[in-house]
């Protein structure tokens, strides 16, 4: 009797269907990660062409290491909000999804911006953890200043992007990434960094542009409400 009720329960989902749902979200997300890694490989390749001593690519490495503290905040909020978003979508509580995602983005942007501004202001001292070279310190400090804008876009991108994936709208972030990671990040690194001669500063302008453009796209997609019709659970 119990087994029959469990089998006929509308809440019971076949393993094959669950696997299909996992692939529906997981495969596009994997593609986005692969596209990002390829894009960053091209960025590093261009930065290696900026000088023979590797000053610019090393400066980016230092700046990235410092900025990762800001990134951790955004990533944590994005993951936490994604879990809550999944719950609310399952309960058809779309207004709660919207409010929660908006709050997570606001808190993330404020926290990441405060950290980024602090790192930029104290960059002259923080970079000395890695090196005492004056030229390197000055360059990394400039990159940390640009990183304020980059983190603003990246946190927004993370929160709204993860929320879209959780809702089942996993293809849109991949399309945005495929277009703008290569146009803005890779193309910007080449144009601003090599063509205009801004070197690592130019590369960071391209990277910041990529994050901010994709962030705007994620927010607009979320506000369009199209994700409400892409839920994995009926």
Task: Briefly describe each language-model feature range.
Residues 3-27, 85-150, 192-234:
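Short alpha-helical transmembrane segments in multi-pass integral membrane proteins
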Residues 7-10, 32-35, 39-40, 74-81, ...:
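Juxtamembrane/interfacial segments around transmembrane helices
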Residues 11-42, 65, 69, 73, ...:
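Hydrophobic faces of transmembrane alpha-helices in multi-pass small-molecule transporters and flippases
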Residues 29, 33, 41, 45, ...:
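Transmembrane alpha-helix boundary and packing residues in multipass membrane permease domains
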Residues 34-65, 69, 87, 125-134, ...:
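Helix-terminus/linker motif at the lipid-water interface of multi-pass membrane proteins
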Residues 35, 39, 43, 47, ...:
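Alpha-helical membrane-inserting segments
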Residues 44, 57-123, 154-177:
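Small-residue-rich hydrophobic transmembrane alpha-helices
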Residues 74-78, 147-166, 172-184, 188, ...:
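Short runs within selected transmembrane alpha-helices of multi-pass transporters and secretion channels
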